[in-house]
Amino acid sequence: MDVSIPKSQHKTVCRTEYGTLQKVILCKPEHMTIKDVINETQKHFEDDNIHVKTANDQHSRLVEALRSHNVEVVLLPVRDGLPEQVFTRDIGFVIGEKAFLSSMTEPIRQGEEAVIKDFFHSQGISYTRMLDTSIEGGDVIIDDDIVYVGISQRTDISAIGQLEEALPEYTIVPVKLHEKFLHLDCVFNIISESEALIYSQAIEPDAADMLAKRYDLIEVPEDEQFTLGTNVLSIGKKTIISLPGNRHVNQQLSKRGYHIIEIDLSEIIKSGGSFRCCTMPLIRGE
């Protein structure tokens, strides 16, 4: 499938996780707090909670890094009462040239869809609303004509049928996660046509075997899964944004010829998401 589409031709186009990132949605963590614990990472950091100034400083460095690599960054407006807004990946996703509006599971996050819906309307972006199911963008990973969908705490198996109906030209592949793991991108991420990061213990054996036949898998150790070693962000041309503390992951990627941009996102990670979670790509090229 041709991915060499000029930036100006489409308002949304994403066909891989590793094509050159051209336009992406983020949101500042201005109201970030661990209020209602909704994942295992938050349980660990509930007493420490979030230092909002530190989180904002770290987020600003991520935005600066993206812009310095010629990525157009769209910052959504922040709203009171939405402490998880920083994790823009979950509220929507783009597959091919089609945008989708997610259906959020947790009540504390359910106001976030309205913000991205307002943005879509303001930009004249048509979208498909996922109804009568639950699905979040952290469970959606694309690789050309294949879409992997995590079946998790946040995404229900009923979403598969809706995606198949909306995307008949794609193969939709469900990937069952063990219950404690939040999203597919917390344990799996494709970084090239042939390579992917994985924490295989989080994935049902049949699904892990299927992925091993398709990709050269780079195993993430347990301690670096906790700091979301798989949740890197590829910006194209074998350049990846990753956490400095995930040394094993970064060393393995460097050995394979990837350029690593290390940014500290440790304050935001306390709430259960890292670089991929904080970014919703609108346009990727080759």
Swiss-Prot record:
<protein>
    <recommendedName>
        <fullName>Uncharacterized protein YkgA</fullName>
        <ecNumber>3.5.3.-</ecNumber>
    </recommendedName>
</protein>
<dbReference type="GO" id="GO:0019546">
    <property type="term" value="P:arginine deiminase pathway"/>
</dbReference>
<dbReference type="Pfam" id="PF19420">
    <property type="entry name" value="DDAH_eukar"/>
</dbReference>
<keyword id="KW-0378">Hydrolase</keyword>
<feature type="active site" description="Proton donor">
    <location>
        <position position="183"/>
    </location>
</feature>
<feature type="active site" description="Nucleophile">
    <location>
        <position position="277"/>
    </location>
</feature>
<comment type="similarity">
    <text>Belongs to the DDAH family.</text>
</comment>
<dbReference type="GO" id="GO:0016990">
    <property type="term" value="F:arginine deiminase activity"/>
</dbReference>
